[in-house]
Curated annotation (Swiss-Prot):
Its EC number is 2.1.1.-. SUPFAM superfamilies: Dihydropteroate synthetase-like. It comes from Eubacterium limosum. Residues 1-247 form the Pterin-binding domain. The lineage of its organism: Bacteria, Bacillati, Bacillota, Clostridia, Eubacteriales. Pfam families: Pterin_bind. Involved in the degradation of the quaternary amines L-proline betaine and L-carnitine. Component of a corrinoid-dependent methyltransferase system that transfers a methyl group from L-proline betaine or L-carnitine to tetrahydrofolate (THF), forming methyl-THF, a key intermediate in the Wood-Ljungdahl acetogenesis pathway. MtqA catalyzes the transfer of a methyl group from the methylated corrinoid protein MtqC to THF, forming methyl-THF. The keyword Transferase applies. It comes from the Bacteria. This is Methylcorrinoid:tetrahydrofolate methyltransferase. Induction: Up-regulated during growth on proline betaine or L-carnitine.
C-alpha cells in the first residue's frame, strides 16, 4: 500500500497556524512522525492565500527535506506553483495533481519529459465541468489523461488515478461506483495505481474515522493501492497491515507481525 501522509496541509487549522507563525518545530515534528509511521510520501500543501502560497510551500519543503528522507508529494491546486517548486525537490517524489481542468496538463506534463523516471503523478478525474457523476465519464477522463501523459514519458505504472470518490452522505452508491471505476480503469491499464483521499467518503457523517477505516479496507479489496491518509493513526495502519495479509500479499504475515513488534499497530505497549 502506497501511503501519502496528509498531515502537512494548510487546510488543517493547526497547520495553517504553524505556517502563519513560521513554526518550524511543528512542521518538522509532523514530518518525522509521518515518516516513522511508514509514509511512502509526505504531502506538503501550503493551502494559504495565493499571494504567499509559493513562499509558504518552499518554506515547508525546506523543513521537511531537512528532517526526513521520505520523498515529497508536492501539492497545490495551482499548476504554476507546482512547476516552480518541482526543481526544489531533493529526490523524485509525487506531483499532486493534474486533471482535465484548465491548463493543468499543459503546464505539468512537460515537467516529466526529462525528469528522473521515478517521479510519479496524481491525476484526478475531473475537468472544467467539475467531477463527473457517471462511472463511464470518469473512465473516459482517465484514458484521456493517461494517453496524454504517455507523450511525456509517463507510463501508467507511474500514475495514481484519483476517481474523486463522492461523500456517502450525498451519494448512496458512492463506494459501489468507486468499485466500478476501479474495475473500468484497470481493465484498460492493469498496472496503474488507484488512489483516494480517504476522508472524502465520510464527509457529513458522524464517527468519520470508523467510516474511513472500513472504506479503506473494502477499497483495498477491490484494487485501491494508494491513499492520502494519516499514517500516524494506529487504527488505520493496523487495518492496512491486516487487510494486506488477508489479501495474500504478506507472506506468512511477516509484515503484519513486524509492525506489531515495532509498536506501529495494536494496543500501545508499555515501555
Amino acid at each position: 500500500m502506497i501511503i501519502i501522509g496528509e498531515k502537512l496541509n494548510g487546510a488543517i487549522p493547526v497547520v495553517k497556524k504553524a505556517i502563519e507563525e513560521k513554526d518550524e518545530a511543528f512542521i518538522r515534528d509532523r514530518a518525522i512522525a509521518q515518516a516513522e509511521a511508514g509514509a511512502t510520501y509526505i504531502d506538503v500543501c501550503a493551502g494559504t492565500a495565493p499571494e504567499i502560497e509559493l513562499e509558504s510551500l518552499k518554506w515547508m519543503m525546506d523543513i521537511v527535506q531537512e528532517a526526513v528522507e521520505t520523498p515529497l508529494c508536492i501539492d497545490s491546486p495551482d499548476p504554476e506553483i507546482l512547476k516552480a517548486v518541482f526543481p526544489l525537490c531533493k529526490k523524485p517524489g509525487l506531483v499532486n495533481s493534474v486533471s482535465g481542468e484548465g491548463n493543468k496538463m499543459d503546464v505539468l506534463l512537460p515537467l516529466f519529459d526529462d525528469a528522473d523516471p521515478t517521479w510519479e503523478l496524481v491525476a484526478m478525474t475531473c475537468d472544467n465541468a467539475g467531477i463527473p457523476n457517471t462511472v463511464e465519464k470518469k473512465v473516459e477522463l482517465t484514458k484521456m489523461m493517461v494517453e496524454e501523459a504517455k507523450k511525456h514519458n509517463l507510463t501508467p505504472n507511474r500514475i495514481h488515478i484519483d476517481p474523486c470518490v463522492m461523500a456517502l452522505s450525498t451519494e448512496n452508491h458512492s463506494f459501489l461506483n468507486f468499485k466500478a471505476e476501479i474495475e473500468g480503469i484497470r481493465e484498460i491499464y492493469p498496472d496503474i495505481h488507484i488512489t483516494s483521499g480517504l476522508s472524502n467518503i465520510s464527509f457529513g457523517l458522524p464517527a468519520r474515522k470508523l467510516m474511513n477505516q472500513n472504506f479503506m479496507t473494502l477499497s483495498m479489496f477491490v484494487g485501491m493501492d494508494s491513499a492520502v491518509m494519516d499514517p500516524t493513526s494506529r487504527d488505520m495502519m493496523g487495518a492496512i497491515f491486516a487487510t494486506d495479509a488477508l489479501l495474500g500479499n504478506d507472506r506468512l504475515c511477516r509484515k503484519y507481525s513486524k509492525a506489531f513488534r515495532q509498536g506501529k499497530i495494536g494496543p500501545v505497549q508499555a515501555k
